[in-house]
Amino acid sequence: MYYEIATMTLPFSTAAQAAGHVQAFCSAPEAGGELLGCWFTDIGTLNQMLVLRGFPDVARLQAERQRTQDGGNAFGCGSIYQSLTLDSYRAFPWMRPVRPTAESGLQGPVYEIRTYGIKPDGVQPTIDLW
């Protein structure tokens, strides 16, 4: 499974408006990924929205990334957001899909999102340690 975290910096008090646009963009017939979650920061860097999408393969992730970047209206929020970053991740082989289900154990409205870097040539040793 492949994942993308989009981080948008928004002007104060535009989060609800942006969330509606994100929902519409990600549920459009031409959308190629699955919207897994949308969060707003209230600790750390404020006025950011994080959008988590999942993809079954890298080709669909790349196609959806292209759709997101084309036209200057990413997530339907082109007139709202001040900055946008798109980060892609591939799940480790032992990971269950990241989506709120009984199987994954994910539930509730509050999540802590962390990212970690891995040294060059460190992916396989990390997998082996797990």
Please state what every model-predicted region is:
Residues 2-11, 92-130:
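Surface-exposed interaction/gating patches
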Residues 15, 45, 57-60, 93, ...:
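Generic "edge-of-domain/loop-turn" microfeature
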Residues 9, 27, 34-50, 72-109:
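Glycine-rich beta-strand-turn "strand-cap" elements at beta-sheet edges
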Residues 7, 17-24, 57-59, 80-85:
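A generic short-segment signal for beta-strand/edge and adjacent turn/coil regions
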Residues 14-35, 66-77, 122-130:
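Short amphipathic alpha-helical segments
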Residues 2-9, 37-67, 108-117:
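Short, well-ordered beta-strand segments in beta-rich or mixed alpha/beta enzyme
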Residues 18-21, 50-53, 64-66, 99-104, ...:
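Surface-exposed beta-strand edges and their flanking turn/coil or helix-capping segments
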